[in-house]
């Protein structure tokens, strides 16, 4: 295995470990992993459409829709009708913000501590590098992905 392949494998495994960490955190918090991501997406205080959340957080639209229905029934999200277009934007209600804080408190603390520990060893530029790498990987995979029906 050449050096690039070794580095790519380490990056792939690192991102999978991070995903796994969130998965196990969600299980411990007794929420679905995609609900945790949805709360994270909405916790920035800005309105978002279901399509935006599906695209930005890489969650299937049907899963976003199902989770939104559950959160709406629990009183945690509300739809806004003031945005242009036919799709309504979502926001957390006051109860939803309290629920998100309760579910995510330990997660945010863990993330901050992990970032602080990382910044003790590495430059903050690692975030830009990781973001750029993610953009490049997605772009290259998109260019090379087989189309449906290709064999």
Where are these regions (language model features)?
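C-terminal regulatory/oligomerization modules of transcriptional regulators
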Residues: 1, 121-151
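N-terminal leader segment of winged-helix/HTH proteins
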Residues: 1-29, 98
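Alpha-helical initiation/capping and key positions within long helical/coiled-coil segments
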Residues: 3-6, 10, 56, 63, ...
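N-terminal positioning helix adjacent to the helix-turn-helix/winged-helix DNA-binding module
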Residues: 7, 33-35, 95
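Generic structural signal for well-ordered, non-transmembrane alpha-helical segments
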Residues: 9-16, 94-98, 124, 131, ...
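N-terminal helix-turn-helix DNA-binding core of bacterial DNA-binding proteins
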Residues: 20-63
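DNA-binding alpha-helical recognition surfaces that contact promoter or target DNA
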Residues: 66
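Charged, amphipathic alpha-helical coiled-coil/dimerization segments
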Residues: 69-128
């Amino acid at each position: 295995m050449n050096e690039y392949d070794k580095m790519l494998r380490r990056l792939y495994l690192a991102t999978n470990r991070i995903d796994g960490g969130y998965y196990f955190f969600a299980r411990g918090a007794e929420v679905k992993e995609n609900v945790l991501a949805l709360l994270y997406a909405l916790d920035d205080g800005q309105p978002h459409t279901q399509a935006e959340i599906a695209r930005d957080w890489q969650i299937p639209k049907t899963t976003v829709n199902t989770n939104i229905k559950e959160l709406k029934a629990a009183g945690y999200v509300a739809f806004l009708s003031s945005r242009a277009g036919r799709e309504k934007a979502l926001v957390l209600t006051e109860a939803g913000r309290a629920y998100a804080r309760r579910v995510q408190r330990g997660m945010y603390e863990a993330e901050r501590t992990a970032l602080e520990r990382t910044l003790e060893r590495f430059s903050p530029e690692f975030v830009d590098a990781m973001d750029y790498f993610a953009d490049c990987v997605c772009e290259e995979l998109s260019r090379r992905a087989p189309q449906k029906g290709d064999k």
